[in-house]
Amino acid sequence: MARNVYGLDLGTYDIKIFDKKKDRIWHAKNVIAMKDKKYIFSVGDDAYEMYEKAPGNIQIIFPMKNGVIARFDDMQYLLGDLLKEERSFIRGAEYVIAVPTDVTEVEKKAFYDLVLHSEAKAKSVRIVERGLADGLGLGIDVPEEPGAFIANLGGGTTELSVLSYGGIVMNRLLKIGGEQLD
């Protein structure tokens, strides 16, 4: 039986999950609707439908800010709910998380802990720098590529990376993304 490996990209506005076994990408909005500041009312795409339309007693919360986890408990609830919803996720699978390169070790550990202690009951969790993950996702032979420039324009950040022979030569995480350009 082939092992189950999932790649996660937790962005400011979107969550992307790659299922290696099924060779498919699953998308969901990275948002929570909270009622009266204490009850989770809705998550994911359903919560996003309420964005800028919700009444005053419903708050729309984005658990990520500038590419990192800003509200750990909310992010953990959201990820757990999404994994329960998507029945194809197998407990005991391996997870690879793409994280921005220019973040602190504490911020990277938050991504690691988020998945390790989630509903996924992960067998293993690995962190990979987003620039390398982007290169692989684009079909670039990263270990053999003499040079590639990659720009990842996200909702809250833009990450610029120069890759060469399997490594990142230069990387910048800019705290400007689609929300500022809209």
Features from the language model and the residues they span:
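Nucleotide/phosphate-binding catalytic cleft detector across ATP-hydrolyzing
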Residues: 1-28, 33-41, 45-151, 163-182
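A structural feature that tracks compact, well-ordered secondary-structure segments
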Residues: 159-161
